[in-house]
Design a protein with these regions (language model features):
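Active-site acidic-Proline motif in GNAT/NAT acetyltransferases
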Residues: 81-87, 111-112
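Conserved GNAT acetyl-CoA-binding A-motif
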Residues: 100-112
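Conserved N-terminal entry element of GNAT/NAT acetyltransferase domains
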Residues: 1-10, 145
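Short hydrophobic/aromatic beta-strand or adjacent loop that forms the aromatic wall/cage
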Residues: 51, 137-143
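Acetyl-CoA-dependent GNAT
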Residues: 6-83, 94-96, 100
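Conserved active-site alpha-helix within GNAT-family acetyltransferase domains
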Residues: 91-92, 112-129, 135-137
Length: 147
């Protein structure tokens, strides 16, 4: 049975592996194994201390996670295991993000991640312009949801 709960330090390895697996499936041409040291450092020093993190688990197996910084409404990550795509996990995690930040959310979505763009549009996010992700350098769409 799927449960949502707050992230715990013991989830770190599973959360990082979930991120790697999911992004590798989304962008198979990129080497996410090579990015793991960078991601682990970012996870530990930026996301964990500054974000509310919710994980979705089924029988102890992480199927998704969401990070939102309540200070600036920035939804940094919604990650769902490829085998759980289309199962409602992303909707539940996004619902938690909206509960944590009821006044609104902002996110950068890679311009070529059409699946994610459709998902956010379906859930009330609107296009706010084009930009470049300051971390990856990839072109992104700024998207926002307001209550």
């Amino acid at each position: 049975m799927l449960t949502l709960r707050s992230y715990m330090a013991a989830d770190e390895d599973a959360a990082i592996e979930l991120w790697r697996r999911t992004w590798q499936k989304t962008y198979p041409e990129l080497d996410f194994d090579a990015r793991l040291p960078w991601w682990r450092e970012r996870w530990r020093t930026i996301l964990v201390p500054n974000s509310d993190i919710v994980v979705a688990a089924d029988d102890g197996v992480l199927l998704g996670l969401m990070t939102v910084d309540p200070r600036n409404r920035y939804l940094d990550q919604v990650v769902v295991a490829p085998e759980a795509w289309g199962s409602g996990v992303a909707e539940k995690l996004l619902g938690e993000a909206k509960r944590i930040s009821p006044s609104g959310l902002d996110i950068f979505v890679n311009k070529d991640n059409f699946r994610a763009i459709r998902f956010y549009e379906k859930h009330g996010f609107s296009f706010g312009g084009e930009d470049v992700n300051p971390i990856s350098g990839r072109p992104v769409n700024k998207m926002s949801w307001r209550s």
